[in-house]
Design a protein with these regions (language model features):
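Helix-loop-helix junctions within the multi-pass membrane cores of secondary transporters/permeases
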Residues: 299-378, 446-455
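Transmembrane helix boundary and interhelical junction motifs in multipass membrane proteins
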Residues: 78-82, 234-237, 305-313, 343-350, ...
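Signature of multi-pass transmembrane helix bundles
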Residues: 1-9, 13, 18-22, 28, ...
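Alpha-helical transmembrane segments of multi-pass membrane proteins
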Residues: 83, 188-191, 292, 327-335, ...
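Cytosolic juxtamembrane C-terminal amphipathic helix followed by a basic/polar low-complexity tail immediately after
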Residues: 425-461
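Membrane-interfacial loop-to-helix junctions in multi-pass transporters
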Residues: 180-186, 266, 281-289, 321-328, ...
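Short amphipathic alpha-helical coupling elements at transmembrane boundaries
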Residues: 61-72, 101-105, 166, 174, ...
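Transmembrane alpha-helices that form the ion-translocation and gating core
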Residues: 40-48, 112-140, 263-300, 305-309, ...
Length: 461
């Protein structure tokens, strides 16, 4: 009976959100309302039944139909969107003629900002005096640590040359399912090969190239149609996800890890400010960027998926920031698997500095710091973009530094809370790379960038 009431409350709130849609309330406003309602519902459930209660445990599978169902739909569109977005980038003549230069700037920005993120993570951890042995480990943390060790053991069986080979797409259709940890970068590589093939065809067989371009444009339009349908479900997905996250969170554990949570968000905010400084150094107004990117960053924050944010990422760059479609498609897509500032930069660097003292290593020695920064930057290749990316990056970094991986499990109770900020920073990093690259290559439409954002929403109701 109580479970039925809990589910009914969620459905009533979903109906309320639908009514707001019927009244033409802006998409971004409905997402924020869903976020607040989800938090309040989660707090209400936990206050009524208590953390870990049977009522909450029995209710969550029903909430997951909406929450996890929404995440599954985001995963469904991620790979096709990455594939067609990069392929479409090559049909734009501007990027076709300047591909090498554009790719260099995008990769340099993504990897460079990841290295900077690692430095910020190291500095913040030192400033807050964080150490892994200061944190109490319960059953959940120990179980998480054991799971990470098991996963690391399977990864350690593969040599470095084999890991590099794994980046290549032996079966692109298999990688389009996202079945491997490196599937995203494999799809990117396959798309790039097809893109170069298109450029060759366009030089020799113009009529065939025109037909191919029309086909790519048609598929892109079809995929984007599916994307828009899925994105319209965002308020309902966010409502269920936030209700579940808050209802199942152990606030006692979060309070005990409050120092780490605060340190993490300080680091994430500092890196975001660095993004703004980079834009300012190229002669752009960073305040304009903040105003125009906020809606997309809020979506990334609440959904916790960089891949699911890709369509909004690209649309924000092209329609609001003046980035050509080719550069926006490439920076957004590459940013899903390379140089994620939050998940592959700040987080593993903080963990490495926290864990090092437990095995007698001074984390402030120059040799250790240089090793952390270098390994973090290199290991940012191939990080997953729909959940689990930070864990994958942490295992790679800790393994390379020969640090105990099990201690990474101590943060499981605050993982969802921190992951929200990390995801938003990942998306900001890829957008900054796109805008900066367009600026440096002379492709940025500064008139669009400096024009106040129109009332047209990113996601149509």
């Amino acid at each position: 009976m109580l479970v039925t009431i809990n589910v009914a409350m969620l459905l009533l709130l979903a109906v309320f959100l639908y009514m707001l849609k019927r009244k033409n309330v802006k998409f971004s406003v409905r997402v924020m309302i869903a976020l607040v309602l989800g938090i309040l519902l989660g707090i209400g459930l936990q206050w009524t039944y208590g953390v870990g209660s049977q009522e909450i445990t029995s209710t969550m599978p029903w909430y997951n139909i909406i929450g996890n169902g929404y995440i599954k739909l985001l995963q469904m569109i991620a790979m096709p969107l990455i594939f067609i977005s990069i392929l479409m980038a090559f049909t734009k003549m501007t990027i076709g003629k300047k591909f090498g230069r554009i790719a260099f700037f995008i990769l340099a920005m993504l990897i460079g900002t990841t290295a900077i993120s690692a430095i910020v993570g190291i500095g913040t951890t030192t400033l807050f005096d964080l150490e892994a042995d200061q944190i109490m480990q319960g059953e959940a943390e120990l179980a998480r640590g054991e799971a990470l060790v098991e996963r690391a053991e399977t990864m350690q069986d593969v040599t470095l040359p084999q890991q590099i080979v794994e980046l290549f797409p032996a079966n692109p259709f298999y990688d389009l399912t996202g079945a491997r940890a490196t599937s995203t970068i494999a799809v990117v590589m396959f798309s790039v090969f097809l893109g170069f093939a298109y450029l060759q065809v366009s030089k020799r067989e113009r009529e065939i190239a025109v037909t191919i371009k029309k086909g790519i444009d048609a598929i892109y339009a079809l995929v984007m149609g599916v994307v828009r349908i899925v994105l319209r479900l965002t308020p309902y997905g966010i409502l269920a996800i936030m209700a579940r996250t808050v209802a199942t969170s152990d606030f006692g554990a979060i309070y005990s890890l409050g120092k780490f949570v605060i340190a993490s968000y300080v680091a994430l905010i500092v890196v975001f400010i660095i993004h703004l400084i980079i834009l300012a150094l190229t002669g752009l107004n960073p305040i304009v960027y903040v105003k125009k990117a906020t809606e997309t960053l809020i979506f990334a924050f609440t959904s916790r998926t960089s891949a699911g944010t890709l369509p909004l990422n690209i649309q924000t760059q092209t329609e609001r920031l003046g980035v050509p479609e080719g550069i926006a498609n490439m920076s957004g897509s590459l940013g899903l698997s390379i140089g994620q500032n939050g998940c592959a930069g700040v987080y593993p660097a903080m963990l490495a500095v926290m864990i090092a003292p437990t095995v007698g290593i001074n984390p402030l020695t120059p040799s250790f710091l240089i090793a952390v920064i270098f390994i973090v930057a290199i290991s940012s290749f191939g990080v997953a973009s729909v959940g689990g990316g930070a864990t994958f990056a942490a295992i790679l970094v800790l393994s390379a530094l020969d640090l105990p991986i099990a201690l990474a499990g101590i943060l499981i109770s605050v993982e969802p809370l921190i992951d929200m900020g990390r995801t938003a920073l990942n998306v900001s990093g890829s957008m900054t790379a796109g805008v900066t690259t367009a600026r440096l290559t002379g492709e940025l439409d500064t008139q669009i960038y400096n024009t106040p954002a129109a009332d047209k929403p990113l996601v149509e109701s």
